[in-house]
Amino acid sequence: GERVAADVVVSNADAAWTYSRLLPSVARRRWTDRKLDRARYSMSLFVWYFGTRRRYDDVPHHTILVGPRYRQLLDDIFERKVLASDFSLYLHRPTASDPSLAPAGGDAFYVLSPVPHLDSGVDWAARAEPYRQAIERHLEATLLPGLRDAIVTSRVMTPLDFRDRLLSPNGAAFSFEPVLTQSAWFRPHNRSEELDGWIARHAKGWT
């Protein structure tokens, strides 16, 4: 490793990762290994980015598609920690506001599907593409006719990416689950309580 002297350290990684990996346990009074291990972590997300060769001008910038069993789906995600066969989706079409974000005549999208974090044991290496295809079929049947044949670029993010690329424990998309004892003041603060000059700014929202 390399030792770097600094007056201020800014971490954009997840709070739990930052404290457990960058600050030795002897220097932590509040965010101990025991507390981090016992914390409850938020759901994760399956994110599909895609571009199309045609425009869908009747689709707004933001669309939420709520499935038929929303409450039960939340139980699947947070309590049972299973990947359900149905989903509720958020569809983002930025080209509705700025057409320059895609080539002329095309559209850009991403769609988010809430899924359980990695404690679920879901084999995302095997399940990612079938899950993407299920979302594709649903969008084609509800909002985006002819979607399959219109796609020109496609990329997915799974909970594995949240863990490995964004350094989020358990692949959680929103760090600690916002239960009462982990909400507001009880969440990690942007200015660390553990060490002067340690500023932890979490892109997925600590506060």
Each PLM stretch: what is its role?
Residues G1-P103:
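Mid-domain catalytic core of redox enzymes
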Residues V10, F50, V111, I135, ...:
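Hydrophobic, well-ordered secondary-structure elements that form the walls
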Residues A16-R21, P103-H138:
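Conserved FAD/dinucleotide-binding core of flavoprotein oxidoreductases
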Residues R40, P99-G106, L195-H202:
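Short glycine/proline-enriched loop/turn "hinge" motifs that connect secondary-structure elements
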Residues L45-V47, G106-A108, R148:
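Extracellular structured ligand-interaction cores
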Residues R69, A96, P116, V156-T158:
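Residues that form or immediately flank small-molecule/cofactor binding pockets and catalytic motifs
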Residues A84-Y90, P145-T207:
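A glycine-rich dinucleotide-binding beta-alpha-beta segment and adjacent secondary-structure elements
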Residues E140-L144:
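C-terminal substrate/ligand-recognition segments
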